[in-house]
């Protein structure tokens, strides 16, 4: 091999190493936070959740590929009026949010990502919308629409399915996370942080009353009627592109007892 060829090979190897999202032998750690707003037994609520991903080796975490969020038992999904309309995935892909009715929106969020060749501070995807999708096998389906701009330009649609739970968990939102390219045909970005809500907070729906369009706020899922000792448990399983996985847990504290009048 000529000196020029060796130099090119070494340069290519260095570039590949610089673009790797995590160092060899390192693993991902996740911190999970959840909330009920309001946190009152039996009340309509907005469920908030967020997570932060880091790499034990100090580099970027491996791209996230799957998330299973396990929700506390006793949450009432029957009385909610979230998702009175259905958003069709094909319309969402083709037309974006304009392709779906306002009454299909069920939550909001944002994400912080980093490109493999970035400086580590992260770039925000400020708009992630959660919408009610067509049910699958009788299960609730949540569509997520992420609208990324510079430097990560991407409009991505992916979905989660609410599966029945067991034990202390009443359901599991199973979501496959698509890889987000950093540039066209480039390596995927790493997700550093996600914040999201499912519930009526900041949502406005519309209905027709006597021929007039009237705005109203939908009813969210309900906080369980009783709180187990230690609080409402949440757990999440995270899967990554490098084949590793990890589990994060947290609790929402039990609400204070109601004051007797």
Regions flagged by a language model, labelled:
Residues 1-11:
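Bacterial N-terminal signal peptides that target proteins for export
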Residues 4-6, 23, 131:
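A generic signature of intrinsically disordered, low-complexity regions enriched in glycine/proline
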Residues 11-21:
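Bacterial N-terminal signal peptides
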Residues 25-261:
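Ser/Thr/Pro/Gly-rich, low-complexity intrinsically disordered stalk/linker tracts of secreted
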């Amino acid at each position: 091999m000529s000196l020029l060829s060796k130099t090119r090979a070494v340069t290519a190897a260095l570039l590949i190493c610089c673009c790797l999202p995590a160092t060899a032998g390192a693993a991902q750690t996740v911190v999970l936070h959840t909330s009920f707003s309001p946190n009152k037994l039996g009340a309509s609520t907005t469920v908030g959740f967020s997570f932060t991903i880091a790499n034990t080796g100090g580099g970027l975490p491996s791209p996230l590929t799957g998330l299973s969020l396990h929700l506390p038992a006793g949450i009432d999904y029957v009385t909610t009026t979230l998702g009175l309309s259905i958003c069709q995935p094909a319309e969402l892909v083709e037309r974006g949010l304009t392709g779906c009715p306002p009454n299909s929106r069920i939550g909001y969020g944002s994400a912080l990502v980093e490109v493999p060749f970035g400086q580590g501070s992260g770039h925000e995807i400020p708009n992630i919308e959660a919408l009610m999708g067509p049910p699958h096998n009788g299960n609730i389906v949540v569509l997520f629409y992420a609208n990324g701009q510079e430097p990560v330009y991407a409009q991505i649609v992916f979905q989660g399915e609410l599966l029945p739970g067991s034990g202390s968990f009443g359901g599991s939102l199973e979501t496959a996370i698509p890889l987000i390219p950093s540039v066209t045909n480039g390596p995927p970005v790493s997700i550093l942080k996600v914040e999201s809500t499912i519930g009526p907070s900041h949502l406005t729906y519309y209905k027709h009353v006597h021929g007039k369009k009237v705005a109203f706020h939908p009813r969210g899922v309900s906080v369980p009627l009783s709180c187990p000792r230690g609080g409402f448990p949440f757990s999440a399983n995270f899967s990554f592109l490098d084949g590793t996985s990890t589990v994060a847990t947290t609790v929402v504290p039990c609400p204070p007892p109601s004051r007797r009048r």
